[in-house]
Amino acid sequence: MTTRLLLVRHGETEWHAENRYAGVTDISLTPRGAAQATDLGAWAGRSGVDAIACSPLSRARLTASPAAEALGLTVEVQEGLREVDFGWGEGRTIQEMADEDPEAVRRFREDADSGAFPGSEPVARAAARATASLRDLADRHPGGRVLVVAHNTLLRIALCELLGLPLGRYRRIFPRLDNGAVTEIEIRGTETALRSLNVPTAPPPAPAPGPSPAGD
């Protein structure tokens, strides 16, 4: 039986607004991030979600909370959905790291697996725990739709692993998952299909008013 997983990156934080690697550092949401969580909650309330799971980090939990309230569900916190530990890169921007060690950044950009930052969690290990969590959710909710709130790097790595794509190229294959946007996959047994990528949950902006009719 097919299970649909609705993968969502948490709302914006101060570090993400500055393009800093947050990793396992527990950074809370900005006002914009809280608004993204509210939009996700409204979207989930009309989208037929059967269960919700999230990373233990507060930015993911706060993003999942409005959806849980809208649906009357309890959020299942899964340790396997925690963001990758970036080691030396935690709290830094790429430019700051390049200023200190340009060769380390070059290796990372070339292959984020073999060129991972010093002290960081191996990409293969992160992929294994993330996919184990996602498959567990799929197994326990056959035929259901599960909202999963996690992190930009972890979800991209998991997508590569599930779709049989090279882990070290996750940054090139999936350049970015937007805050609060939904990426939908289907899991059926050992097979995974990508149904959509980076679909926004915020309502579209209201159209600008047109010119007044002649004579008004």
Where are the model-predicted features located?
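Acidic, low-complexity terminal tails and accessory targeting/binding regions
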Residues: 1-3, 84-96, 144, 160-216
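Generic beta-sheet signal
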Residues: 5, 144-152
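General small-molecule cofactor/ligand-binding pocket signal
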Residues: 6, 76-78, 195
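Loop-to-helix element that buttresses phosphate recognition and phosphoryl-transfer chemistry
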Residues: 12-67, 113-131
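Short active-site segment of divalent metal-dependent hydrolases/proteases
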Residues: 13, 154-155
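Glycine-rich phosphate-binding loop signature in dinucleotide/nucleotide-binding domains
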Residues: 45-48, 137-144
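Short, well-ordered beta-to-alpha junction loops that form the rim of enzyme active sites
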Residues: 56-57, 80, 149-153, 197
